[in-house]
Amino acid sequence: MALAHILGYPRIGANRELKKAVEAYWKGDIDQAELERRGQALRAEHWQASRDAGLDFVTVGDFAFYDQVLNVSAMLGAVPPRFGAIDGDVDLDTTFRMARGRAPSGTPAAACEMTKYFDTNYHYLVPELHAGQRFRVASTRLFDEVAEAQAAGHPVKVALLGPVSWLWLGKEKSAGLDRLTLLDDVLSVYGEILERLAAQGVEWVQLDEPALVQDLPRDWRQAFESAYNKLQSAPVKLLLATYFGALGDNLGLAAGLPVAGLHIDTVRAPEQLDAVLDRLPTYKVLSLGAIDGRNIWRADLAALRERLQVARARLGERLWISASCSLLHVPVDLDAETDLDAELKSWLAFARQKLDEIVTLAHLLDGRATPEDTARLEAATSALDARRQSPRIHKPAVGERLAAVSADDAERASPYATRAKAQHRHLDLPLFPTTTIGSFPQTQDIRAARRAFKSGELSRDDYEARMRDEIAHAVERQEALAIDVPVHGEPERNDMVEYFGELLDGFAFTRFGWVQSYGSRCVKPPVIFGDVSRPGPMTVRWSEYAQSLTDKPMKGMLTGPVTILQWSFVRDDQPRDATCRQIALSLRDEVADLEAAGIKIIQIDEPALREGLPLRQGEWQEYLDWAVKSFKLSAAVARDETQIHTHMCYSEFNDIIAAIAALDADVITIETSRSDMELLDAFQDFAYPNEIGPGVYDIHSPNIPEVEWMVSLMEKAAEKIPAERLWVNPDCGLKTRGWAEVEPALANMVEAARELRRRYG
């Protein structure tokens, strides 16, 4: 009998209950006991959903109040000294301090670095690793949650990030440290954790090792062998979980490790199934990630049943069926989407529906389909046939325009050196010009107005009048602060991707399709279901109005084609690069319209450019080629004197600096404050020719940056980049902060720029 299970479930709740609870706790509106009670209620609800669907286990360990990697760091006692907790238990407040930047005394402390989890839009807190670091079992949270599930009568499988991938995701904080020298001590704690889980009666523990789908140096491959040879004595069965891609040259390594089972991703890498079947020892379970854990399209159950029959025949009782990865990356429940049109809704499956798909597929492969399974199979086949034939998908005019694009369409009229001279004459900005990344605080009043407008309580005219008031306020505050290049603040935008998707054809929107980005931050990705085109201008009137309020050059704000693609649920019936070029052409028209409206600076944000990189370096160039061409296609229509900015956050640039330069943006703003300007090394080594705004303060922390601290960061930047090519700006947009934090932070930033002009002018 094929067993059905999942690697993890969304923890935010169908109505973002987790976000609301955590933020209420941070504000002091609820106490920790109430926060824990709400977390327990969410876990109970999610475990019950698994049982109701018919899964053979509930998965325990996928829940976190902030981040599952942070949970492991806390469990291992891997807390940076500035946050205390050197001995004893690591409590919830300590983990929040690590994430948000506070010392135990309440004074500001640098938050732990945050970066993308492999190639997803989920962000994790990077473990900080030090020479001589001591590890211990420092949290009982996992054991407590196991006891919770058992008390509710659930059969438990524990999910935990594996020891090697935890180290792989970490960062050395001691000069000359090799992370792998810490592995033995980490393994000792993992061994103790597994012993304690066994004592609780846990039979299966899933250890996530997604590092195995990447290019691993020899010493890391050896580390996997060493680690799992040591862990094989643990009195539990280990399921080694790999996902986000193919095992590739690590297949033999993964198949040969002394564990009881292996999970592979057969959505991202269906081609690896036959090779894994050939290499898997006859005693091991093989868990097939056959249902897409990262996208929302309904599974083709008939095709999967046919394709996986060979695995069923060869494995028999050793076959498990699952999603490709944790369902963390998809929304919770499609049933909540009562406003979505019936045809489009029939093409989709969210996390709750994917539980049903997993169970039905297992039943179909076993030949034990229930009437409900048969009905589900027939409904899926019918919906997918309708999707393939729907006239909503393909628009001939879009295809014709795309086919007519030439190489010249992606090139600016003049090289950067020529453009820079024209822009400096046109803009007349000071040394170290100041700007922000685009968004200003989304206040309760703004959110209330948007809700009232969407519910019909507020007319369009009244809503737009309120948004103009908010724009005027943002411009007024920037004028008072003496920001050199203001922005309109984006009060009219609910989300930097969703806003554009609502104004483009080929997109659809959900009401409850939230997924976790980091901590309490959730995003609601648009659904790209068909060909993309722009019916009309999207941002022009807002930027034009903002420009009318100031003599300074107002910066127009667009989200780039690659980021719109990466942060959407993308159609799976054509190559991603084709969809990206369709978006780029729509943005190209917007750039032309902004320029015609008198906007002299246009920012095309691409924070997700690096995120789209394949996990295997051998596949990078193909992706970078089309990603860069898409960006340039959107920007190249601009005249020489129009300055094109781009912004990238949470990015590492060393290995893609040539592609960054190939974007040919006049100014690039990047997140650097958490990395102490280390990211600029890549630009220095590459002799990057254009202008750069290295972020001088971390907007994810509520701390107010000091003037001298920002000056010192910019002085480090000026050692690597000529002062005349440096801008002064925050790391990222200010949407999630409050005005009480933003104004003093920006005032200090402007003062830092003045001091820099005194020193370098």
Swiss-Prot record:
Residues engaged in binding L-homocysteine: 437-439, 490, 605
Reaction catalysed by this enzyme: 5-methyltetrahydropteroyltri-L-glutamate + L-homocysteine = tetrahydropteroyltri-L-glutamate + L-methionine
Domain of life: Bacteria
GO biological process: methionine biosynthetic process; methylation
Enzyme Commission number(s): 2.1.1.14
Record keywords, A-Z: Amino-acid biosynthesis, Metal-binding, Methionine biosynthesis, Methyltransferase, Repeat, Transferase, Zinc
Protein name (Swiss-Prot/TrEMBL): 5-methyltetrahydropteroyltriglutamate--homocysteine methyltransferase
Organism: Chromohalobacter salexigens (strain ATCC BAA-138 / DSM 3043 / CIP 106854 / NCIMB 13768 / 1H11)
